[in-house]
């Protein structure tokens, strides 16, 4: 996730791509979703829900039909949860949905994930992210860390844009 300002670290984020489906012919509407992440006695809710593939939409309701919908889900911590950091340990991730018309939330699934000391040290550095991919032979999610490439400098991008405009004008003059 990008920081909200240049001086801030990015907020912790949980990203999932999942297929949701309804067992009824009429389908259902997901009013909201959130992730509850717990380690030992610490629990953090990731209650800011954003979803979509091409265009992200802040959790505003999602129709789920009988054939299902596969979509990317991003869960962020609220501003008051910004002190949360991923550290070494065993985590339980619970994904909940609030369905239209239901009084109680529904637990969609729960997964245990492990973060080693080495991975936790890497995550303390800026621009690193942790990914879990399914290992079919081990029947568990396996972690790996990746560093996000740096964002281009805004001034450099503006110069590049000016150079492209200049080249376009030169080509237009030559074609006359």
Language model features with spans:
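Extended low-complexity, serine/threonine- and proline-enriched intrinsically disordered segments
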Residues: 31-49, 94-97
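Terminal connector regions
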Residues: 79-131
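Short, surface-exposed linear segments at secondary-structure transitions and domain or protein termini
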Residues: 40-42, 54-65, 115-127
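Extended, solvent-exposed segments with strong compositional bias
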Residues: 46-88, 96-105
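Contiguous beta-strand segments within globular domains
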Residues: 4-35, 65-77, 140, 146-157
């Amino acid at each position: 996730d990008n920081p909200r300002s240049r001086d801030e670290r990015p907020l912790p984020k949980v990203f999932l791509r999942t297929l949701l489906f309804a067992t009824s012919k009429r389908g259902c509407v997901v009013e909201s979703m959130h992730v509850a992440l717990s380690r030992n006695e610490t629990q953090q809710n990731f209650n800011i829900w954003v979803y979509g593939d091409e265009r992200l939409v802040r959790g505003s309701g999602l129709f789920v039909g009988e054939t299902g919908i596969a979509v990317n889900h991003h869960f962020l911590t609220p501003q008051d949860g910004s002190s949360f950091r991923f550290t070494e340990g065993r985590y339980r991730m619970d994904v909940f949905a609030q369905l239209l018309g239901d009084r109680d939330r529904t637990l969609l699934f729960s997964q245990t994930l492990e973060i080693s000391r080495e991975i936790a040290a890497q995550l303390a550095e800026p621009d690193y992210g942790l990914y879990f991919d399914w290992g079919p032979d081990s029947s568990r999610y396996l972690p790996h860390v990746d560093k996000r490439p740096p964002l281009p400098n805004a001034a450099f991008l503006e110069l590049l844009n000016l150079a492209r405009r200049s080249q376009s004008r030169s080509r237009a003059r030559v074609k006359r």
